[in-house]
């Protein structure tokens, strides 16, 4: 069984997920923790549950999904893993802070530790996450899909009732193709996105104007 803990982070309410299983190994997805209390909440949860973080994953390279990477690196020696197409975003996280979010950061971000290949499999504990290339919101956006638990972490590609914007280095053509890829998942797949509440592939096919097969 997969345990999923959501943390809503930073000034635009980004969803960070800590997922674990009975092995106590865990994966941190999209650590957007900006404020100190958000960072401590994630670290304290990991300590309380006696978890062992083994991967720091990012669905894409926008700063709101990576604010807290330095804390995870300092606490657990994990570097972020991200799609290769977002390498330039990851090199310029400090620039994003000032230009996009209007804030200054007085710390350095850890370098990327690994760039994903499409359909790469990430293992932790007794579970696997399949990397699905879903560009469009950004050039290197990915979705993490756990087939055993039928859950997809879609970042900012797919939201409940909507999709991610494409004017920050993305492409509408690419995101529509990515949505068609996600539409091939089972209808009862739980979708956990980068912002907002959960949904399912079936609900999005029924109600999201951007989704079809």
PLM features: residue spans?
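Short beta-strand or tight-loop elements
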Residues: 2, 112, 118-120, 125-130, ...
């Amino acid at each position: 069984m997969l345990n999923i803990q959501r943390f809503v982070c930073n000034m635009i309410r980004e969803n960070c997920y800590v997922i674990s299983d009975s092995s106590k190994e865990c994966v941190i997805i999209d650590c957007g923790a900006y404020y100190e209390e958000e960072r401590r909440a994630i670290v304290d949860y990991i300590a309380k549950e006696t978890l062992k973080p083994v991967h720091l994953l990012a669905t894409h390279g926008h700063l709101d999904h990576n604010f807290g990477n330095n804390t995870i690196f300092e606490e657990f020696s994990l570097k972020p893993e991200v799609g290769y197409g977002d390498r330039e975003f990851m090199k310029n996280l400090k620039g994003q802070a000032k230009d996009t979010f209007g804030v200054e950061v007085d710390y350095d971000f850890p370098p990327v530790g690994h760039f994903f290949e499409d359909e790469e499999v990430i293992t932790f504990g007794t579970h696997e996450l399949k990397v699905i290339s879903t560009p469009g919101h950004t050039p290197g956006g990915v979705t993490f899909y756990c087939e055993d638990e039928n859950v997809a972490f879609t970042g900012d590609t797919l939201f409940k009732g909507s999709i991610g914007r494409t004017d920050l280095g993305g492409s509408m053509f690419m995101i529509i193709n990515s949505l068609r890829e996600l539409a091939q998942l089972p209808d009862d797949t739980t979708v956990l996105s980068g912002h907002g509440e959960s949904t399912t592939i079936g609900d999005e096919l029924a109600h999201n104007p951007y989704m079809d097969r």
